[in-house]
């Protein structure tokens, strides 16, 4: 299931060699929030991971899959009602069809999510 342009939207994207910076917004009325949680939307952790994957796919123009993860940390609840714009940072190194990534979702000094892992071209 693709989340881009339905669950989340890219407001600004600044790719440069080995670094992607983006600003996104989450659709607080998306059907995912009917169950997570009604009236109090909280972005599911799996959606945070998928946001990183889809932004990388948009940058490299190829489908990727998370094949290894050293660290996945969900540090703060991310609410689309309270956090209208979310910053995304993906530091990556290409290595033989794989991408070593260090990614985070944050707003100001509040870090919601961190991921260190390996993406493989699908």
Model regions: which residues?
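Residues that act as N-cap/strand-start positions at coil-to-secondary-structure junctions
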Residues: 6, 84-86, 111-113
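Long, contiguous binding/interaction regions
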Residues: 2-3, 72, 118
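Catalytic strand-loop segment that frames the active site of acyl-thioester-processing enzymes
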Residues: 2-43
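Compact, glycine-rich, soluble single-domain proteins
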Residues: 39-44, 48-49, 53
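A broad structural signal for short, well-ordered beta-strand segments within beta-sheet-rich domains
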Residues: 8-11, 63-69, 112
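HotDog/MaoC-like acyl-thioester-processing domains
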Residues: 15-18, 91-122
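Hydrophobic beta-strand-centered segment that forms part of the acyl-chain substrate-binding groove
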Residues: 53-92, 98-99
